[in-house]
């Protein structure tokens, strides 16, 4: 009886204690912010405004270059993108953000993009973070590998993100197919050549380095090859490598 009573006391005291610890760990994991996101939110307003203006100027110059025949290229920095996200997006393009999401920021690392934003869930708020690896399979064929999605440190299902990608490509009338790499879903999006006064746009290079995103291509005149030249003449997309993303630890995600 004494042993049973002691066991019951331990259970009565231990179960609530374990529950409190588990709840505390869950709360800590739910509210954990990626290091890059905390740093981005601490950027001074003047720096953000300057970055936003730089991005808008470079984007305008890129559009002008694309409209001319010949090669074009541009380089955008994470500071410029975050400046635009902080200043111009909420002011002039707030409808682009899904309801409940705010303060988006990005980090550019070699070969990958980290995106994070705040999301209110009832009385609580968390930081959602997504890691993607975008690259070109061939000119005008963009692959986006969705590596992970988290709320704090807690992994989230990828299905809602895949549905958002499918919806966005449908709205933009861009062909989409799905592939896999290392168990991760890969969205393969065909960027249809734009025809404007006989000019055709070809996106030929996309590189992501630490803090920088580089894009380049060519604008040509004349006819573009048929969209379906046949299985023999169509270029074959390379086989996707089953490569796992580099692991920088939970704080980097």
Place the predicted regions along the sequence by residue.
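Extracellular/lumenal and peripheral-membrane lipid-interaction modules
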Residues: 2-253
């Amino acid at each position: 009886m004494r042993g049973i009573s002691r066991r019951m006391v331990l259970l009565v005291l231990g179960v609530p204690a374990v529950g409190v610890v588990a709840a505390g760990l869950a709360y800590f994991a739910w509210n954990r912010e990626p290091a890059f996101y905390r740093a981005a939110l601490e950027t001074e307003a003047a720096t953000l405004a300057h970055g936003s203006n730089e991005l808008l100027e470079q984007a305008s110059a890129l559009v002008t270059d694309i409209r001319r025949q010949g090669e074009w290229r541009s380089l955008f920095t994470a500071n410029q993108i975050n400046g635009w996200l902080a200043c111009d997006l909420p002011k002039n393009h707030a409808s682009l953000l899904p309801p409940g999401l705010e303060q988006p920021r990005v980090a550019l690392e070699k070969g990958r993009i980290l995106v994070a934003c705040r999301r209110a869930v009832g009385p609580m708020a968390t930081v959602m973070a997504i890691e993607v690896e975008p690259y070109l399979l061939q000119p005008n064929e963009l692959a986006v590998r969705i590596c992970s999605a988290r709320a704090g440190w807690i992994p989230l299902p990828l299905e809602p993100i895949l549905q958002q990608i499918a919806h966005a490509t449908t709205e933009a009338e861009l062909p989409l197919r799905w592939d896999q790499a290392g168990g991760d879903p890969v969205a393969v999006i065909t960027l249809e050549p734009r025809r404007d006064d006989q000019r055709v746009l070809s996106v030929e290079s996309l590189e992501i380095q630490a803090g920088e995103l580089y894009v380049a291509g060519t604008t040509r005149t004349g006819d573009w090859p048929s969209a379906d030249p046949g299985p023999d003449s169509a270029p074959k997309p390379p086989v996707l490598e089953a490569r796992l993303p580099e692991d920088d630890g939970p704080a980097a995600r």
